[in-house]
């Protein structure tokens, strides 16, 4: 089963469960230029420009979390790619999967801007840029 947490809830979960891994599934460009949560593991689910699924995704996750009972929190821009990635991990046998709702940037506002009404960065959680 895949659970959902808001960014503040995910941050509290990570503090309470040091064995958990936060996996940022966004593209390399998003991770580097938009920013990313501090201490997140970067494993792209899809990559720009063709948006094909990363065929090494599952192997890369297994490198950082070999134990299928490791709690894995997945984060993307707004919460959809991370959910897709979590479904694949669930099929692969991972049992503690959490989709971070709102993602890093949150949904678009009325002006078609992100980061104004949700997301990791909006909530003031620890993040950095490369």
Regions found by a protein language model. Give the residues of each.
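Short, surface-exposed ligand- or partner-binding patches at beta-edge/loop junctions that are enriched
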Residues: 75
């Amino acid at each position: 089963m895949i659970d959902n947490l808001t960014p503040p809830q995910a941050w509290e979960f990570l503090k309470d469960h040091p064995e958990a891994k936060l996996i940022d599934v966004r593209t390399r460009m998003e991770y580097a230029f938009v920013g990313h949560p501090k201490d997140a593991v970067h494993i792209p689910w899809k990559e720009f420009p063709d948006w094909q699924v990363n065929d090494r995704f599952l192997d890369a996750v297994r490198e950082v979390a070999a134990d299928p009972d490791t709690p894995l929190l997945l984060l993307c821009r707004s919460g959809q790619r991370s959910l897709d990635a979590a479904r694949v991990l669930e099929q692969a046998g991972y049992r503690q999967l959490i989709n971070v709702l709102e993602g890093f940037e949150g949904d678009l506002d009325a002006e078609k801007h992100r980061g104004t009404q949700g997301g990791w960065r909006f909530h003031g959680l620890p993040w950095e840029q490369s």
